[in-house]
A protein has these predicted regions:
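ATP-dependent carboxylate-amine ligase
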Residues: 2-7, 13-167
Length: 167
């Protein structure tokens, strides 16, 4: 019972039946590894920080892939200042096997990870998604977390599932 007359069990049951929006969050398995795909928005550190908190909450060994194709479709310049508002320091722990940086700014992401004191041997730069997913499938450990801008979600999923590839 509550002050406003809601039944807690009923409320929890109703909320648990809300379907997951697969455009924002997706989960499947690959080779006995759970693959989480978290859709983020470039230029928006808040979405990336929420994804990092989700990753941090799960304490198993994991591999991450982080990147995007385009920073902005609105502007003609590539402002990366927002990258330094992302709390990559949350990943500075023993639960990370590898962090694979992809896309045109893969080296910029790797540099930001180094500033977060992530061990350099955990940071891998592979700009092309097809090559990155091959590496993840064969040379990494743990569950897989894709922290990706919306423009990389479909190519990542397709390459992980062995469907039509794309970079």
């Amino acid at each position: 019972s509550s002050l406003i007359g809601l039944n807690l069990d009923e409320a929890c049951n109703t909320i648990s039946k809300i379907p997951v929006n697969l455009k924002i969050f997706n989960k499947y398995t690959f080779d006995n590894r759970i693959v989480y795909v978290l859709n983020n928005k470039a230029e928006n550190a808040t979405t990336y920080n929420q994804s990092l908190l989700f990753v941090k909450r799960n304490t198993e060994l994991k591999t991450l892939i982080i990147g995007w194709k385009e920073i902005s479709r609105r502007y003609n310049f590539d402002d990366l200042s927002w990258l330094y508002d992302i709390e990559f320091e949350l990943l500075n722990n023993n639960e990370i096997d590898k962090i694979v940086c992809i896309g045109p700014q893969a080296y910029d992401i790797a540099t930001r990870l180094k500033y977060a004191n992530i061990e350099e041997d955990k940071i891998v730069v592979i700009p092309l998604i097809e090559e990155a997913t091959k590496f993840i499938k064969s040379k990494t450990k743990g569950n897989i977390y894709g922290i990706l801008n919306f423009d990389m979600v479909e190519p990542f999923n397709n390459n992980m599932k062995g469907e039509k590839s794309g970079n």
